[in-house]
């Protein structure tokens, strides 16, 4: 059934990457960091997937959008 109980072990609690590493500012020019939070299709990954806190998710979204606007990151990934 779709709504039945889950089988298996306990889920691991997701930890915010930025809080854990003491990062207070997300720079839009740091494309290697931003790429970690973008899917293979080029979409921004949601909080429930990455475990990022709400504060840093907002900062991350703004940084990714700025990087896209400045052509540092693609809006969509190349089709192979």
Swiss-Prot record:
The keyword Nucleotidyltransferase appears for this protein: no
PROSITE patterns named in the record: RIBOSOMAL_S18
GO annotation, cellular component aspect: cytosolic small ribosomal subunit
Gene3D superfamilies per the UniProt record, alphabetical: Ribosomal protein S18
GO MF annotation, one: small ribosomal subunit rRNA binding
Keywords: Ribonucleoprotein, Ribosomal protein, RNA-binding, rRNA-binding
Swiss-Prot/TrEMBL GO biological process terms: translation
InterPro entries registered for this protein in UniProt: Ribosomal_bS18, Ribosomal_bS18_CS, Ribosomal_bS18_sf
Highest taxon in the source lineage: Bacteria
NCBIfam families: S18
Quaternary structure, from the entry: Part of the 30S ribosomal subunit. Forms a tight heterodimer with protein bS6.
Similarity section: Belongs to the bacterial ribosomal protein bS18 family.
Biological role stated in the UniProt entry: Binds as a heterodimer with protein bS6 to the central domain of the 16S rRNA, where it helps stabilize the platform of the 30S subunit.
PANTHER family according to UniProt: 30S RIBOSOMAL PROTEIN S18, SMALL RIBOSOMAL SUBUNIT PROTEIN BS18M
Protein name: Small ribosomal subunit protein bS18
Species, as recorded: Staphylococcus epidermidis (strain ATCC 35984 / DSM 28319 / BCRC 17069 / CCUG 31568 / BM 3577 / RP62A)
Phylogenetic placement of the source organism: Bacteria, Bacillati, Bacillota, Bacilli, Bacillales
Gene: rpsR
């Amino acid at each position: 059934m779709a709504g039945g109980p889950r089988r298996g072990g306990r889920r691991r609690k997701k930890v915010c990457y930025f809080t854990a590493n003491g990062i207070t500012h997300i720079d839009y020019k740091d494309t290697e960091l931003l790429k970690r939070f973008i899917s293979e299709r080029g979409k921004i990954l949601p909080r429930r997937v990455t475990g990022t806190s709400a504060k840093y998710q907002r900062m991350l979204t703004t940084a990714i959008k700025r990087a896209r606007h400045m052509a540092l990151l693609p809006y969509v990934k190349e089709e192979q």
